Regions:
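Acidic/polar, glycine-enriched structural segments that form the non-catalytic walls/loops
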Residues: 1-211, 445-449
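The feature captures the catalytic groove of carbohydrate-active enzymes
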Residues: 207-215, 261-309, 320-400, 594
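Well-ordered alpha-helical scaffold segments within catalytic/enzyme domains
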Residues: 165-170, 187-190, 221-232, 278, ...
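Gly/Pro-rich turn-and-neighbor structural signature
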Residues: 167-199, 203, 357, 382-423
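Alpha-helical scaffold segments in carbohydrate-active enzymes
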Residues: 183-190, 241-248, 313-325, 362, ...
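Helix-terminus loop motifs that line ligand-binding clefts
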Residues: 192-207, 233-292, 298, 305-307, ...
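Active-site core of glycosidic bond-cleaving carbohydrate-active enzymes
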Residues: 215-243, 309, 365, 372, ...
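Non-catalytic C-terminal accessory modules of carbohydrate-active enzymes
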Residues: 1-4, 473-478, 485, 502-625
């Protein structure tokens, strides 16, 4: 007997709750008897905890359909799973009251040279707890009947073709990174591609249970730029999640004896999920990261309605939190933050962390600018917001004063920002003196030993110098890069991309390419030996930034988009696109020139030159930093 088995399956991108499977069995030699068993199952174990977290109160089985509803034990979230088949089978004979698995059995005789195909169309969707599950599940069943495998396949193909037209990055001369960056782009689209205000981007995306699906402060910093230039609707959903969890952020602030809203450092539902107080209580970058996300969304979309409807409220509450978390120095009268932890988690309970203070100052000033804009452009909406939040003029005056008096430890002579008070006095441990077997330090050193050194886990000063790049001269950027880069051990997968981007800006081609070396293939090649736990989603987003913001030299923090492309000597050329306010910009870079065009007339800055693009491709000589 010789048998051919063909398995086809897909998860629909345009219809994001749908999936389909098709099994084709062909009897190549001899007659065969086959039995196929198709399941819907919630009988899965959390890998690290070895525990099942589902209850299944609803089951429905017919000769050509299955339905089951799962309710998560801890958070009581409802998930409906429904599927229909294009053939009739034998239902599960008996079910326990809370069975987590249902099935249909299909038995067939296939004659030699004959074939049998079984197709399933499935829907998996969230249900609000107070919705009528019977009504929702019945509607799901009726909805599935309008689709076929071929329809879903064709729609999926069209969706991906459209996405690659916008999102593709092409590298000539580096097949490994060509494959790697396309893998990264594919994963970013799979992770989030629709306007779902309840969606979060977990540290592992949808690919693993590590970090329990929680999103972290770096979502707005690393992931949002990708979506803003490739899928603005998905970008807005990231901010929607923060707006819809504003009540939880307010409760978190109260728990920390603060005003306003304190966004959690790790969350899946809006509530703080980090059980390490030194991270959960001391890190303010989740809140200032929300500010950065709103600011960048405003800058790159011009969506004033969203800003006025939702952004302003979040900014007011974040500013209230920062004003109550910070304090004035009794000796100098300057304002700053005490007992905090910045992005570099190797330094705890520090005073005047540079990133924290800088981002807080930006938050105060952006909030004030937005409220002034609302007062002029939408006075009625502004007054309604003021009344609803009981916003006082005195608060605005205080925020202005706090921003003006913010402590920023900058030395005009050395052009260095001190990462925090006393950082320059910390003992220096040379990285080459640490035995290889002691890495990662988090797993091999006592916490207090880590805190007693000037080593960095990931960039802190360099982080805000990337986010607000146009605020800093090349001399200041170079001084800080030269000082902090040798002290960073990159124990976060997010760290190399920041250094690569800034190295490219400074003309440090070897540094830029070396830091880029692991970016696109971290999970494909399992560099960190932990891909089995899930993909490094924010690092994958950083890989896209590494090419577009790094070698492409994109800067999106000014009035105009700015490009300063460079190219690794190992590459012949590369091409990427930017979807900016409805205009598609195409950028091609080779070893001699930069060629650009746009679907609509658009001004941008190329190196030091302001140019206007249109549909006709224009070429300019590449400039070496």
């Amino acid at each position: 007997t010789l048998v051919s088995l063909k398995f086809e399956r897909l998860l629909s991108m345009p219809h994001y709750t749908l999936g389909t499977q098709k099994v084709t069995i062909e009897a190549l030699k001899g007659d065969i008897e086959v039995e196929l068993r198709a399941y819907l199952s919630f009988d899965t174990l959390h890998e690290s905890l070895n525990e099942n977290f589902w209850e299944c109160p609803v089951h429905k089985v017919s000769e050509n359909s299955l339905q089951i509803m799962g309710v998560s034990k801890g958070t009581h979230q409802h998930l409906s799973a429904t599927c229909i088949f294009d053939d009739t089978g034998i239902p599960t004979k008996s079910l326990a009251p809370n069975s987590k698995e249902i099935s249909l059995v299909f038995r067939k005789t296939i004659k030699e040279k004959g074939a049998y195909a079984l197709t399933r169309i499935a829907s998996i969707d969230k249900i609000e707890a107070d919705d009528a599950s019977d009504r929702i599940m019945k509607a799901a069943m009726q909805g599935l009947s309008q689709y076929s495998f071929n329809q879903l396949l064709a729609a999926n193909k069209a969706w991906w073709e459209n996405q690659w037209e916008v999102s593709d990055i092409q590298i000539d001369g580096d097949d490994e990174n060509q494959q790697g960056i396309r893998f990264c782009i594919f994963q970013m689209h799979q992770t989030l591609h629709t306007a779902d205000h309840t969606a979060v981007i977990g540290a592992k995306g949808l690919t693993g249970e590590a970090y329990n699906g929680n999103t972290f402060w770096d979502t707005e910093v690393y992931c949002l730029p990708f979506y803003l230039f490739n899928n603005p609707e998905a970008a807005r959903s990231i901010l929607d999640f923060r707006y819809n969890t504003l009540p939880e952020a307010r409760e978190r602030a109260k728990a920390l004896d603060l005003k306003g809203a304190f966004y959690p450092i790790a969350t899946i539902s809006g509530k703080e999920c980090c059980d390490l107080w030194q991270h959960a209580n001391l890190q303010l970058q989740a809140s200032t990261g929300v500010m950065y996300g709103i600011w960048l969304y405003d800058l790159l979309t011009g969506d004033a309605a969203y800003l006025f409807d939702k952004g302003a409220e979040m900014l007011i509450e974040i500013s209230r939190m920062l004003s109550s978390r910070g304090a004035y120095n009794t000796r100098t009268g300057e304002f700053g933050f005490y007992c905090v932890m910045g992005p570099d988690e190797f330094q705890m309970m520090v005073n005047q962390n540079a990133y924290t203070n800088f981002m807080a100052q930006k938050t105060f000033r952006y909030t004030l600018a937005l409220l002034s804009r609302m007062r002029n452009e939408v006075p009625d909406q502004y007054q309604s917001l003021v009344n609803r939040l009981a916003l006082l003029e005195e608060e605005l005056e205080n925020w202005m004063q706090m921003a003006d008096k913010m402590i920023l430890l900058f030395d005009e002579h050395t052009k260095l920002f001190e990462q925090h008070e006393g950082y320059f006095n910390l003992p220096i441990t040379k990285l080459e003196d640490i035995p290889v077997e002691e890495f990662p330090l988090y797993s091999h050193w006592a916490y207090d030993r880590i805190y007693r050194n000037s080593m960095l886990k990931q960039p802190d000063v360099l982080m805000f110098m990337l986010l607000f790049n146009s605020d800093f001269s090349k001399a200041v950027l170079e001084a800080n890069y030269e000082f902090y880069e040798p002290r960073c051990i990159h124990e976060s997968s997010l760290s190399p991309s920041v250094h690569s981007i800034l190295a490219a800006q400074l003309g440090k081609e070897i540094d830029a390419y070396n830091f880029f070396g692991f970016a696109t293939r971290m999970d494909l090649d399992n560099y960190n030996r932990n891909t089995r736990e899930g993909l490094h989603t924010t690092s994958i987003a950083g890989s896209w930034m590494n090419i577009v913001y790094g070698f492409g030299g994109l800067r999106s923090d000014g009035a105009l988009l700015a490009l300063s492309p460079s190219i690794p000597s190992a590459w012949n050329s590369y091409t990427f696109n930017l979807n900016y306010k409805g205009t598609l910009i195409k950028i091609h870079v080779d070893q001699e020139k930069v060629t650009l065009c746009a679907t609509n007339p658009l001004k941008l800055r190329l190196y030091q030159l302001e140019i206007e693009l249109d549909q006709t491709a224009k070429s300019y000589l590449i400039e070496r930093a």
